[in-house]
A protein has these predicted regions:
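N-terminal, membrane-interfacial amphipathic/helix-forming hydrophobic leader that caps
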Residues: 1-125, 131, 315-408
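Membrane interfacial helix motifs at helix-loop boundaries and amphipathic/re-entrant anchors
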Residues: 70-105, 158-200, 254-263, 303-323
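Membrane-embedded alpha-helical segments of transport systems
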Residues: 61-66, 111, 150-151, 293-298
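Transmembrane helix-loop-helix hairpins at the membrane interface
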Residues: 203-337, 341-357
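Residue-level signature of transmembrane alpha-helical entry/exit and packing/kink sites
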Residues: 51-55, 98-109, 141, 145, ...
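Hydrophobic residues within the alpha-helical transmembrane core of Major Facilitator Superfamily
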Residues: 57, 159, 250-251
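Cytoplasmic juxtamembrane regions at transmembrane-helix boundaries
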Residues: 122-143, 223-238, 243, 357-365
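Juxtamembrane helix-loop-helix connectors linking adjacent transmembrane helices
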Residues: 103-106, 129-216, 227-228, 232-233, ...
Length: 408
């Protein structure tokens, strides 16, 4: 038996450590920031107490610009009329329900989209976070949700109208609080005969093209920027979910002006449900789809029965109509949430992990290994085999001699 000698220690060279100052903007500590849900999406690594104030300032300035533009347009109408031009009164119902009036109204409300994007960028540096936690619009959810919402709302609205009529309840008209007499000529199914007003083709085109933008503008402002702005002040998750939902729901309902309790409740429930959809899908897409489908159906029916002015200026609904509308809204939202969750949408913002900030200071020279200890297949002097076999034998080892550390 031969004496075993430990293998010679071979010093390894030490790689130089990068030194110097970090590139501008690289302030990460190397750890992954905690994932954030949509209401707290703006509480990212760059969040500071003053950043929400910047976003608020941009929003106020934007609203001031929009208001000023509207006032200038009204002033232009007044000046043109004083010079003898025959123009419709911009404050009249006739102008409101005209193609030009609907175009101005819808595009004015659609300005909520760029306003929310600009305010979000000013506050967090990522404008797309107001659309979804991925920082972009998820078009599959938006377009698919719009189709599902339209199918649901048409089916439920027509179905309940027929059902209520068969049960002896009024279906629209003066009894429905719209101020029209269409219900007096309703047929046995509860579906009114179509009586579109003149110019309905141009009006339908304007509504079809701009109503989705109008609905998106309201959602981007209320459920988007305003919800995230409130959530950026709140550290606790459940408060950041509940408080923005309640506040924006109330403001959304109040923004529609004077209204009866049932109409206010209907709009409040819609706002609360939209906030739930945004939270549980991680973005605005499903809420925008439900809002756009609801308005497209409402405006489409109003044009078909020449009741667009009554639909836009509605201030009250009877309890039955309000309760039915709330039930349809809740059922539609529940189905949309189920459909969206089947697509497994992202629910949290994930920030990229940045490397550790680089140390500043002189660069240390690399440690050099001595020449006599350089690794190689042959070491100086006689080599005595180790009694410990390697983890994996080289090819042919079994033929060269005993294995598993056996000696003879």
């Amino acid at each position: 038996v031969t004496d075993a000698m430990p293998p010679a220690a071979v010093p390894t060279s030490t790689a130089p450590t990068p030194t110097g100052t970090a590139p501008p903007g690289l302030t990460s500590t190397g750890t992954t920031p905690a994932p954030r849900e949509y209401p707290q999406a703006l509480r990212g690594p760059k969040h500071r107490w003053w950043r929400p104030l910047v976003g608020l300032g941009v929003t106020v300035a934007g609203l001031a610009v929009v208001t000023g533009a509207l006032l200038l347009s009204v002033l232009a109408f007044v000046i043109a009329e004083s010079m003898g031009a025959e123009l419709p009164d911009p404050a009249s119902d006739a102008f409101l329900v005209s193609p030009a009036g609907m175009l101005i109204t819808n595009l004015g409300l659609a300005l909520g989209i760029p306003l929310a994007l600009l305010a979000t960028w000013a506050q967090a540096g990522r404008a797309g976070l107001v659309s979804s936690v991925l920082g972009r619009v998820r078009w599959r959810l938006l377009l698919g949700g719009l189709g599902v919402a339209l199918l649901l709302l048409v089916t439920l609205s027509v179905g309940t109208d027929i059902l209520l009529t068969q049960l002896g309840f009024p279906a629209g008209g003066e009894d429905a609080g719209t101020g029209s007499s269409a219900g007096s000529s309703a047929d046995e199914t509860g579906l009114w005969p179509l009586t579109p007003a003149s110019g309905w083709i141009a009006l339908s085109i304007v509504i079809l093209l701009t109503t989705p933008l109008q609905a998106a503008g309201e959602e981007y402002f209320f459920r988007g920027w305003l919800s995230q702005w409130i959530g950026s002040w709140l550290r606790w998750r459940w408060l950041a979910v509940a408080v923005p939902a309640v506040v924006t729901g109330l403001l959304f309902a109040l923004a529609h002006g004077a209204q009866s309790p049932w109409l206010f409740a209907d709009r409040l429930v819609f706002g609360l449900l939209a906030s739930l959809l945004v939270w549980r899908t991680g973005g605005l897409e499903i809420a925008v789809a439900m809002h756009a489908a609801n308005n497209l159906l409402a405006f489409g029916l109003a044009i078909a029965y020449d009741e667009l002015a009554e639909s836009l200026l509605i201030t009250e609904v009877p309890p039955l109509d309000g309760a039915v509308s709330i039930a349809i809204t809740i059922l539609t939202g529940a189905v949309l949430l189920w459909w969206a969750r089947r697509h497994d949408p992202d629910l949290v913002v994930t920030d990229p992990v940045l490397p550790e900030p680089m140390r500043s200071g002189p660069v240390a020279p690399a440690a050099m290994a001595p020449a006599y200890a350089a690794p190689g297949p042959v070491a100086p002097g006689p080599v005595t085999p180790s009694p410990v076999a390697p983890r994996q034998s080289a090819p042919g080892a079994a033929e060269d001699g005993p294995a598993n550390g056996e000696t003879t």
